[in-house]
Amino acid sequence: LSGPRNQRITLEAEPGIWLKGSESELRSAFSNLVFNAVKYTQDEGSIRIRWWADAQGAHLSVQDSGPGIDAKHLPRLTERFYRVDSSRASHTGGTGLGLAIVKHVLMRHRGRLEISSVPGHGSTFTCHFAAAQQITGTV
């Protein structure tokens, strides 16, 4: 996934957590978050992916050690075509639609996206799904 960039990717997943919904849409949203982390994390950086459940529901978080994002940009990150800065956009490519698609998919699945970031310390994107969206038992 990260190729010659030598990024360390860690996956922590609780077994037996399933969601009701469109597999292709959820896969698209989750992979978008992971690919963004790979794209914006420097060589030798780290990415942590977590999948867990608690009393509130199921959660997926993607945390990276990338450049981070200034707080003034966070409210607009899920707008279509919004870019933090054009110089970063020309370096990394993309359309500016990825996080808008993630937000749309989560809304269709009664979920929400939480974004936290500190410039120079990376970002964390967390998808939260209500307990009602979970499937219990074996699928």
Model-derived features with residue positions:
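Conserved glycine-rich
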Residues: R110-G111
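Acidic ATP/Mg2+-coordinating residue in the GHKL
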Residues: D64
